[in-house]
Amino acid sequence: LMSSTPRPRPDALTTALPVPAVVVDSGLSHLDREFEYAVPARLDAAAQPGVRVKVRFAGRDLDGFVVARRAEARHAGRLTPLRRVVSEEPVLTPELVATARAVADRYAGVLGDVLRLAVPKRHAAAEKALAMAPPVQASLPPPGGPGPSAAWAAYPAGPAFLRRLAEGEHPAAALLALPGQPPERDWPALVAEAARVALDAGRGVLVVVPDHRDLDRVDRALVHALGPQRHVRLTAAPGPPARYTAWLK
């Protein structure tokens, strides 16, 4: 006997860059590579590089990240369509993928495990609230003091270090901060001034400190040097919503 129930028709697939490369969070080291899928036409606009997706993998629905969209598949067989786009927010940049890949290779790890630790879990309410918030146009305050290297003038190589940052170079340096300095010349102020020089040169800055006490000091120094809402604090203490909001900013 033949069933009279018609089979559901498969989704039409997009024709523009129809092959997404997906890093699947399988947790298995022998599957530590990209997998190719197909993009249904209804997901074409949303399934962009950097977004979270759900994919069918070995009979299960697993999480993944789209890391690229390609015109042609490298896999010779039939491609499985993406199940859905979890969020249209691109949380994974090519630079972050490359860094996570380097960390995984360096320590014999799995890319999916590194990304799970590097990218905070999605918080839908925080994502929605940030999307509805008006954009903040914050500009750098005018520099104070005799010049951008004022706090660094006490260090023989300080002005040269800042100059190389301003010129787009990547100088390596170790700073032994002088003790007993006033706040405007203490090490948090030096870090904040170096960050400002890098930002003036159109670059990003990541400052890592060992504990919350140092975090508070650097936070105050950055507000003084850069103005409000020019940087974010990333810690585990505020909880998932605040951490995810800071990540998206």
Labelled PLM ranges:
Residues L1-K249:
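Accessory, non-ATPase domains that flank or precede helicase/AAA+ motor cores in DNA-metabolism machines
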